[in-house]
Amino acid sequence: DDISVRQEILENLIDEERGDENHPELWMRFAEGMGKKREDVKNTVAIKETKELVDNFMKLSKDDRYHVGFSALYCYESMIPEIAENKIDGLKKYYGAKDGEDTLKFFEVHQSADIIHRQVIKDLIGDICDTDEKKEEALRAIELALSSLNNFLSGMERVYC
């Protein structure tokens, strides 16, 4: 029960939830910038693959072995800066989004903040996974998280493309 680990989790959560420009709010502004009404976004029913993604991440993050939850978080956060960069490029090229607009802010924040988050989490996992068993559990968590993320994207393609 290492307080430094809990502090890192808390710091990550504070970064995402604090202030008027918290991550859920930035996502809503992105959706509005794409022409969606806030109320419509809030009332959207999740597709099967989205529900499975959320369920798997919740299961992993609530696991008593916190290296399992950290591994799932790392799987996600490790990809985000590059994904955000690609999203920004696509939104500019295909949708006419401009730097500094609310439409891009969600991705701009993740492009920079998650570079730090992923390194901190990677270092913590390296410290925490001090046995072969923990390393195997971490890898299994990453595999489930990655599979869930890929399935989520397949669901988006199935429904919206």
Regions found by a protein language model. Name each.
Residues D1-C161:
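Non-heme di-metal
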